[in-house]
Amino acid sequence: MSEQHDGHLRATYNEIHTLIGKAAERIEKEYAPDFAHTFVGGGGFFPARVLRTFLKHPESKRNISIQAIGLSLYEELPSTTEEQMANEVVRTQWLGPETKTLLGRKVLIVDEVDDSRTTLQYAVRELQKDVEKELLLLPESERDAKRPKFGVFVVHNKLKPKRGTLPADVPYFSGEDIPDVWFDYPWEVKDVYEHDRMAELGRKLQAKSA
């Protein structure tokens, strides 16, 4: 077998499952969400489903709800401004009347990786805008109590300068910080056994170079 490696980072399903489980302990302690959103081309579906298992209430057996939004990001130009960045994010799936179900909730936005943070910025900003529209339909005395809180969880956070930003009052959780290199997830490949083999090879080569 050739020892050639493409330099990509990889993790197996089991490793990601375990990583999410450890992160769930922090999320439950510090945020305790009761609603989850997955987004960005489906990358958050698997993490959100695993996270729901770990956040399931031990006594009531109540699961957090999961709804999906989809975002696609075009390649950004070096001269991109914040407004232009937002315009480059395209909605492929979004909430409609379901937005009102967020009122009064602690929402957790879930994705696989925080790369440029552009899509995370867009998701938080646009969901907050939609929620504010729903709040205007309520009596003013009820709005503060019904305003939802938003948090973010990503499996991996790339250590790099971010183009996007998140509000200071939005809790942010990551399973693991990683270098700014391409990361291959097992749900993106057809041959998961080859994926796992390459993941193991990468670890061996990294150990040799350490």
Q: What residue ranges belong to the model's regions?
A:
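Short, highly selective alpha-helical patches that border small-molecule cofactor pockets
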Residues: I20, G44-A48, R52, L120
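A structural signal for isolated positions on well-ordered beta-strands in alpha/beta enzyme cores
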Residues: A36-T38, Q67, L108, K149-F153
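Alpha-helix termini
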Residues: K29-Y31, L55-K61, L95-T99, Q128-A145
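PRPP-dependent phosphoribosyltransferase catalytic core
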Residues: S2-E3, R125-A210
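Short glycine-rich phosphate-binding loop at a beta-alpha junction
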Residues: Y31-G41
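Short, glycine/charge-rich flexible loops or terminal/linker lids adjacent to PRPP-binding catalytic cores
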Residues: E59-L108, D114-R125
